[in-house]
């Protein structure tokens, strides 16, 4: 019989309410079942969720629902990464308080996420701007401080003189602030740091144990930590060329084997020697100031033009005292890396080669590819950076680079300069301590008091939290906490004298570096309940974007180590499994060119397709607009699809199904209206074929068939169940969905026959069993549809609380095997035959293949070799 179309606008809110009333997804920490903690990176409350959120949280929800059905006690929480600059920018632009802006956005986005039907434990929800959360973060800071994991030091920062704030390197564009356009200044500010470098080697070593992380992410972290083994080498300065007190310059190098190719030394603009020379040399001072006006990130240095200035200082080559090299200040050397000084070997480093060509410095090839022409090898436009054989290198000539490395290390380590060895082996790390100070209001206050008598004093825990004041204004640039009339003034907790609060707040990466531990017991007075945290941690499956591969994930790994040192957790690693999903991308549409180009949202367009050509027209005027490239959905390009619109038109299950089904989960998914409509047709088809057969299946006890009419449906269902189970274990959502499509196709006919009536009980029992398997394997992806179908069959209870089905082994075994048939070693065909067929039967069947018969032409083969269930080889 015909049934009404599935109506998600009616069904989805109804089942969401039922799940909520029955507290289906509220997790009990005392539940004795095996735990499974699944977590998606929590969102910044920017205003509305986007399709990237839908994909991310749909993936996590599939994992949570699947693991719950498999019998695990699942923890699947949600919160908000709520501090940060966007709220302050909104405050300045819209005259709204950051707190109000943030909590309004949270309310909107919470409603959107709930409309997706996510199996979240909302009782554990928090925002990082909640006083209750940052109170515990301040307690952690105090504990870290007591453990020696926090310190203050003068640090160079990018200062925007218009916005009165520190800028990250990435926010400095061509020497100017990204928002104000002002020329950025390099300033020395006293900053707070976490000692992440205390754990450099451990953070590196433990990467090998994270075998459920993408290899790409582990490699990115390995490179960021940047362990290198090299030589710390002192170069003697030539008398009368260097200021007093600078008798030598220390350089760290990983390529001491290339020393005979050195043609210059380069030091950073903030090297002590550069500062000393700047005091008396205006040209050097001006050049150093220019270096400080540009971004200090490695990326900025890589792309910037290589510049330098000869200081007039010269150094003696450590392996040849007759050889003197010039010392330059160079814009590509950073004080924060190594010693702030390098030696340049132009033939072995492209940056050094470009610099040498620009300033007319010698280029001596010292490493050549192995071969008979090695001695005559030269370098012109491209440096030779590979290993090879040493040339033009005195006693090193003919050695391989690895042997030359050791020879130089041994020689210089035994050589004295002054009263100490001229060189020593050293392990260096690229990783630097984490500067957490931010000169802004909307962040977690650093719980420290500055007293002229006692110095720096941590706020006693009994006086925590240090709350942000609400009565602040954003009418002038800068940090409102600096100019607050009362908040910053406080008595010293040690001596009682007048003192002042720290007005810097914490980097928002701090907030997201420990939130996963707080979810385990968010009601506790302490940051964690260690026993509960140790039960749940590490997170079994963490899901988020590849853009967080380094900073967020590395900082989180530091935090678990620091929290372990201070007794809050017992684990080292925060995340056992990591999955980085692809983005949701969409075509771009625009009208006009150049400066007059205007981006057009897809909702304002009509798309027409004729003979494979797609054209876009404005709905309002019919004007044709240009279809551009497919890019990440962004507000700037207006190629954004609002999830609310999709859910209102098609339902949450359709949106979920599309973002899960269209491509492998680690790749980008291209949003298309046709794809969404296809997903919706599938949802409607599942409802139709089950709904039409539901009356005939009510009251029928499910039982798979072992023979006869129902066998095909039972085999299809149980084989699909086994395959989907394997796919979901590997997070291969798109593969699981492809198999479900096939199962629906396989069941459509048998269910139509059942719906027509007159089928015997055993056939209906097999159909009921197959349908219940279908419903339960679609439940993680399309949970509302699954509940509606489950209810239509007359089942009591919820699919969300129903165990995962078990496949029948005999129904998933293949009784036949496919064996390739070769003639004289060349494949000529395939043979499908019973798995238990004897060799004579296989031999006879192989000889009956048409391709084999034509080759034999009535003759007999010399030999037939049968490898059981594998291959047949016929020799003629």
From Swiss-Prot:
Recorded E.C. number(s)? 6.1.1.4
Q: Which InterPro entries match?
A: aa-tRNA-synth_I_CS (IPR001412), aa-tRNA-synth_Ia (IPR002300), Leu-tRNA-ligase (IPR002302), Leu_tRNA-synth_edit (IPR025709), M/V/L/I-tRNA-synth_anticd-bd (IPR013155), Methionyl/Leucyl_tRNA_Synth (IPR015413), Rossmann-like_a/b/a_fold (IPR014729), tRNAsynth_Ia_anticodon-bd (IPR009080)
Q: Name one GO molecular function term.
A: leucine-tRNA ligase activity
Q: What class of enzyme is it?
A: ligase
Q: What stretch of residues is annotated with the motif 'KMSKS' region?
A: 632-636
Q: Which domain of life is it from?
A: Bacteria
Which family does this protein fall into?
Belongs to the class-I aminoacyl-tRNA synthetase family.
> Protein name, please?
Leucine--tRNA ligase
């Amino acid at each position: 019989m015909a049934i009404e179309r599935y109506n998600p606008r009616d069904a989805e809110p109804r089942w969401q309410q039922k799940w909520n009333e029955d507290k289906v997804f509220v997790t009990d920490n005392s539940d004795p079942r095996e735990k499974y903690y699944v977590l998606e990176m929590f969102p910044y409350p920017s205003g509305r969720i986007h399709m990237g959120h839908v994909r991310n949280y749909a993936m996590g929800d599939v994992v949570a629902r699947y693991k719950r059905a498999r019998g695990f006690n699942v923890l699947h929480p949600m919160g908000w990464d709520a501090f940060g600059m966007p709220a302050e920018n909104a405050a300045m632009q819209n005259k709204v308080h950051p707190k109000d802006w943030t909590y309004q956005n949270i309310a909107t986005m919470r409603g959107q996420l709930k409309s997706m039907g996510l199996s979240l434990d909302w009782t554990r929800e928090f925002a990082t701007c909640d006083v209750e959360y940052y109170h515990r973060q301040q307690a952690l800071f105090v504990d870290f401080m007591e453990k020696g994991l926090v310190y203050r030091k003068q640090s160079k920062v990018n200062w925007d003189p218009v916005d009165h704030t520190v800028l990250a390197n990435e926010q400095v564009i061509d020497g100017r602030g990204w928002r104000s356009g002002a020329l950025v200044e390099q300033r020395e500010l006293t900053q707070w740091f976490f000692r992440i470098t205390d754990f450099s080697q451990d953070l590196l070593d433990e990467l090998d144990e994270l075998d459920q992380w993408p290899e790409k992410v582990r490699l990115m972290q390995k490179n960021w930590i940047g362990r290198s083994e090299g030589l710390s080498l002192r170069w003697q300065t030539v008398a009368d060329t260097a200021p007093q007190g600078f008798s030598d310059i220390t350089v760290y190098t990983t390529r001491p084997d290339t020393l005979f190719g050195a043609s210059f030394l380069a030091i950073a603009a903030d090297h002590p020697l550069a500062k000393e020379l700047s005091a008396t040399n205006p040209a050097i001072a001006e050049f150093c100031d220019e270096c400080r006006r540009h971004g200090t990130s490695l990326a900025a240095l890589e792309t910037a033009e290589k510049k330098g200035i000869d200081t007039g200082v010269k150094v003696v080559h450590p392996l040849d005292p007759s050889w003197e090299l010039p010392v330059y200040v160079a814009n590509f050397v950073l004080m924060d890396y190594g010693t702030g000084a390098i030696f340049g070997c132009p033939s072995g480093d492209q940056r050094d080669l470009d610099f040498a060509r620009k300033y007319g410095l010698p280029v001596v090839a010292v490493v050549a590819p192995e071969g008979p022409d090695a001695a005559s090898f030269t370098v012109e436009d491209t440096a030779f950076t590979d290993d090879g054989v040493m040339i033009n290198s005195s006693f090193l000539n003919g050695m391989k680079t690895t042997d030359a490395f050791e020879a130089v290390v041994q020689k210089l380590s035994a050589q004295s300069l002054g009263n100490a060895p001229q060189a020593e082996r050293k392990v260096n790390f690229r990783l630097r301590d984490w500067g957490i100070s931010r000169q802004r209001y909307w962040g977690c206050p650093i719980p420290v008091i500055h007293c002229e008598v006692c110095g720096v004093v941590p706020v006693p825990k009994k006086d925590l939290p240090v709350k942000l004041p609400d009565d602040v204004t954003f009418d002038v640039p800068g940090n409102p906490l600096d100019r607050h009339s009362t908040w910053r003034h406080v008595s010293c907790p040690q001596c009682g004298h007048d003192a002042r609060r720290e007005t810097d707040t914490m980097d928002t990466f701090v907030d997201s570096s420990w939130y996963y531990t707080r979810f385990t017991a968010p009601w506790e007075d302490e940051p964690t309940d260690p026993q509960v945290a140790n039960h749940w941690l590490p997170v079994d499956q963490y899901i988020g974007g590849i853009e967080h591969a380094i900073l967020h994930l590395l900082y989180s790994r530091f935090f678990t180590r620091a929290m372990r040192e201070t007794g809050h957790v017992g684990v080292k690693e925060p995340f056992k499994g990591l999955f980085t999903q692809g983005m949701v991308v969409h075509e771009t549409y625009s009208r006009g060119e150049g400066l007059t180009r205007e981006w057009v949202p897809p909702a304002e367009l009509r798309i027409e397709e004729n003979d494979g050509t797609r054209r876009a027209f404005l709905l309002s005027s019919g004007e044709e607009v240009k279809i551009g490239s497919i890019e990440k959905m962004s507000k700037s390009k207006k190629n954004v699809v609002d999830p609310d619109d999709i859910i209102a038109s098609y339902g949450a299950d359709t949106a979920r199904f599309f973002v899960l089904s269209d491509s492998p989960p680690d790749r980008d998914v291209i949003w298309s209206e046709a794809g969404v409509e296809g997903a919706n047709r599938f949802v409607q088809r599942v409802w139709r074929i089950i709904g039409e057969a539901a009356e005939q299946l009510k009251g029928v006890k499910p039982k798979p068939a072992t023979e006869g009419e129902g066998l095909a449906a039972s085999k299809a269902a149980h084989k699909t169940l086994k395959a989907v189970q394997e796919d979901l274990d590997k997070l291969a959502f798109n593969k699981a969905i492809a198999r479900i499509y096939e199962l629906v196709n396989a069941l459509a006919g048998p269910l139509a026959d059942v719906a027509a009536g007159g089928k015997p009980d055993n056939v209906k029992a097999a159909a009921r069993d197959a349908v219940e398997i279908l419903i339960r394997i679609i439940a993680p992806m399309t949970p509302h549809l699954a509940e509606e179908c489950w209810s239509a069959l007359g089942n009591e209870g919820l699919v969300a609380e129903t165990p995962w089905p078990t496949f029948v082994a005999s129904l998933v075994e293949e009784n036949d095997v496919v064996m390739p048939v070769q003639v004289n070693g060349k494949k000529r065909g395939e043979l499908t035959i019973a798995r238990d067929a004897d060799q004579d039967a296989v031999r006879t069947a192989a000889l009956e293949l048409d391709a084999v018969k034509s080759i034999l032409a009535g003759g007999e083969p010399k030999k037939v070799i049968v490898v059981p269930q594998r291959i047949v080889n016929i020799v003629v």
